[in-house]
Amino acid sequence: GDTAQLPPVGQIESPALSKKTLEGYGLEVWDMELTEIARQAAQSAILRNATSLRNLIQFSPLPMPALSLESGDDIENLSGEMLLETLSDCYGRDGIEESIVVTRSNKRATLFNLGVRNQILYREDELATGDMLLVSKNNYFWSEGYKELDFIANGDVMRVVRSRGEVESLYGLRFANVTVEFPDHGNVEIDVKIILDALTTDTPALTRQQNERLFSEVFEEQSGSKAERFKAMKKHPYFNALQVKYA
């Protein structure tokens, strides 16, 4: 693992990278660290900034980080007015799949996604053929029967091939039946049900209130013992609908 990576939530360090923790299990541990960068140009401004930030981690208290953002071979300093035009150029030159916007919050990610769809891709419908969607919650339901997919993972990207039928409104949510393909899994096509409301929430997926309502209403519809109800919910297409964001 990378020693500069964030540790698990609520922990000071990652136990998986701790020699002391592993020795506590009775293991004999050797440790080493790779420091030479092999897959980035030596004069890269990205590498220079990353190395500077990595070196700061050694100090306590941590100094205020500073980035050197002079335009160069791999950094171009843009004004906000130039962002959409530059992003459109990137899409045309490198493709949408090879162009990524990094932003500081889920709320701003939603704003960027809507701006891209409306002002670069000129898509007005909530969901359109060709839309790239990002799965925001692991799902084992819809991949069943497809040998190319063990499960649909949080972070998987899929492309809308076609919509099937009308939007359905149930449990306080809106559902759509779509055929999608997975570029990272040999473009395998599968039919899925997705929750449209999750596309534009300012949270990574559905809000807590939306999840609780979906769970309680689907649970109440089932019959039998508590265990039988839970078992039935595992096969319920609406309860197992994919939660996705624009990618």
Language-model features: locations:
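Long insertion/accessory domains within large nucleic-acid-processing enzymes
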Residues: 202-247
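Conserved helicase motor core of P-loop NTPases
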Residues: 5-153, 159-161, 165-221
